[in-house]
Swiss-Prot record:
It comes from Drosophila grimshawi. Disulfide bonds: none annotated. This is Succinate dehydrogenase assembly factor 2, mitochondrial. Pfam families: Sdh5. This protein may be expected to contain an N-terminal transit peptide but none has been predicted.
Length: 147
């Protein structure tokens, strides 16, 4: 009995669904050059303290645990000492890149960093990722306020 139902289910799954009116069949190529990417809004009048608070939050909420841990510990350790230019470079790094996996692969050395992101801040992040102090990074650090 089961054997006789198997071809029927296979035909149903393999049948042409071109008559479907839903968008379930649309495949998006995320590496395609025609994919429109939203531009990150520039905030020219944002005070430095507020910018650091925003970056601290954004470093913690990346959408992938690997970057949550790496960037939150990095921001906790270094962001408070960044000047305005370094803060702007870090902002561009974590918000100018459209794919968080790229940041992870660059920081861990899996992929080469593009020239526009090869900065002192990226080098500092790469050193942080190497974790030469052998610091346990199983959870995000407590929130710190910079205002």
């Amino acid at each position: 009995m089961v054997r006789s139902l198997l071809p029927l289910s296979w035909r149903r799954c393999a049948s042409d669904s071109s008559n479907s009116s839903t968008n379930d069949d649309i495949i998006v190529d995320y590496d395609g050059p025609d994919l429109p990417l939203p531009e990150y809004p520039n905030r020219p009048n944002e005070p430095l303290g507020m910018r650091k608070q925003r970056l601290l939050y954004q470093s913690r909420k990346r959408g992938m645990l690997e970057n949550d841990l790496l960037l939150s510990t990095f921001a906790h350790k270094y962001l408070k000492d960044f000047d305005e230019d370094e803060t702007a470079i870090y902002d561009e790094l974590i918000n100018g890149v459209s794919n968080d996996w790229d940041i992870y692969y660059w920081a861990t050395g899996v992929k080469p960093t593009p020239p526009q992101y090869e900065t002192d801040i990226m080098e500092l992040l790469k050193q942080h990722v190497k974790n030469t102090e052998k610091v346990a990074r199983f959870r995000q650090p407590e929130l710190t306020y910079y205002l």
